[in-house]
């Protein structure tokens, strides 16, 4: 079994690959005494344990995450994970399909919000078809 430090190191590697060095550096710089344990926890558990598992590739994990964030209305996290989905190889067309599929199970208002957020993210994202 991996040590906490090994899990943290693996988690940081995956977290940086998925979210970008710049995003992770901003998160670390914003860490306070209140949030330090939280940052360690999400790095070890979310990124080191779950995102590092071999059962799904990162594209598939991004689809699962987008669907969940849309369903629960977590808009700030949705914007972050839309960018991550592009980094993980999803296309804008595939993300559109994820949002459309989510509308059936999460509702039209959830999809409306997701499409608005996706439009904003893609417009600002260098290299995406909507951001060129």
Question: Which residues are covered by each model-predicted region?
Answer:
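Alpha-helix boundary/capping and short turn/kink residues
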Residues: 91, 108-111
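Short Asp/Glu-rich motifs
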Residues: 104-105, 122
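Acidic, glycine/proline-rich low-complexity segments that act as flexible tails and inter-domain linkers
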Residues: 1-59, 87, 112-132
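Mid-chain, well-packed structural core segment of small domains
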Residues: 63-66, 70-96
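Substrate/cofactor-recognition hotspot
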Residues: 77, 101, 108-109
